[in-house]
């Protein structure tokens, strides 16, 4: 089943990725029953072109919104500044709770969306599920 996101949210993720250059950008889309409700940009606590970590204060704010509005983490997004829109080994590792064996997904219901700016004029946006460390691409549909 395709991940359906408003075109404006896809454009906002691309804009965010460009604005945060030279570092990776990150954020979330919160929603209910698979329907996107709100995109929230986050600060990259790593401030790195090679890695992202959603700033803990931002993550806490997102969890509070999820609780207050009875939403879910629909999308966790980030950018790759010079590589393809595909989860890196670090991205896969970061999708899991540390030290769990077998692996436990940190956000089992979330889609992972990557924005590649490898070609600055033609950004690429792709969606994935990461389950137990296994990456599966999903169709992404702008609505």
Task: Give a label for each model feature.
Residues 1-73, 82-143:
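Conserved beta-strand-loop surface patch within small alpha/beta domains used
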Residues 76:
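Conserved, mostly hydrophobic/aromatic
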Residues 79:
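Metallo-beta-lactamase
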